[in-house]
């Protein structure tokens, strides 16, 4: 059971996390990083590490982003976002073969609301490798998960046009 002090720390950490996210979306990455770190010092969470990693990715700091995602997985291996994010960062580093396994791990994560992202990203890998049928299947799976995913929509159209 959570003590009163632990509850207060957790709630403050959640406030810091929310403010960090606002700053990140506003483009103030320095403030976002500082606030994510403060939040993590108070209460380490998978979300905090994942979003700090995402902030690093905005700066092209792929290895730092991956390191934060690995910390997120240590905190909560059921959280799906860091698996997908590691795969996406590996694509940026031209390490597609390594990325595939991370996307597959994202599919297995029980606490994940955006399965369209690993499908879309896996489609990107397959398309880059010239495996167009597999890519198309992944893009369609992304569309099924999220019919509004514009990247998946355009990828499906592009690959279907290549077939004709």
Over which residues does each language-model region extend?
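Residue-level recognition of tetratricopeptide repeat
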Residues: 12, 45-46, 79, 115, ...
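TPR alpha-solenoid repeat register
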Residues: 48-49, 82, 116-118, 152
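Structural marker of alpha-solenoid helical repeat scaffolds
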Residues: 41-42, 75, 109-111, 145
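Alpha-helical segment of the N-proximal tetratricopeptide repeat
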Residues: 9-47, 51, 58
